[in-house]
Amino acid sequence: MIEPKEREMHRIAVTGIIWKKEGREYKYLITKRSPHKKAWPNLWTVPGGGMEVDDYIHGETTFANSESPQWYNAVEKTLRREIKEEVNLEVSDIQYLLDVAFIRPDGVPAIVLSFYCTYAGGEVKLDEDAVEFAWITAEQVGDYELIQGIDHEIELVEERLAAK
């Protein structure tokens, strides 16, 4: 088992399962990671990435005059930024799905907060970290080599949407 380098610090990342309804089916956006990526090259995933202090520190604060300023909605701002950077889309109705904690191969503890959100506009334009994209149904997840767990997350979203 990999031991964490720091006991109190975690790398926090967010992912967004973007969905849209086409006819009677729900479709989910997945992207194929570039072969030059160190982690999970050539595997399919959903948009997301790490939180950065700049996602919130220059934004509107609550209790700005205190010794310890606070920023609300930092995770949502990160998710919107990552989706815009990676696939050039706008999203709405962001909903929490689940979280996953693990220790990366480099020893850094990580937490991924996974959300699902409605496609709200734009045309997919990939950044340099992805080489392909597809809008797929939950039934098609087995046709793609996805990063472990993404298939399960898409199935969970499908269940939640079907229950509406």
Question: How would you label these PLM feature ranges?
Answer:
Residues 25-81:
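Conserved Nudix-box catalytic region and its N-terminal flanking loop in Nudix hydrolases
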Residues 11, 90-93, 100-123:
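Active-site-adjacent beta-strand/loop module that shapes the phosphate/pyrophosphate-binding cleft
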Residues 114-116, 125-157:
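NUDIX/MutT-family hydrolases
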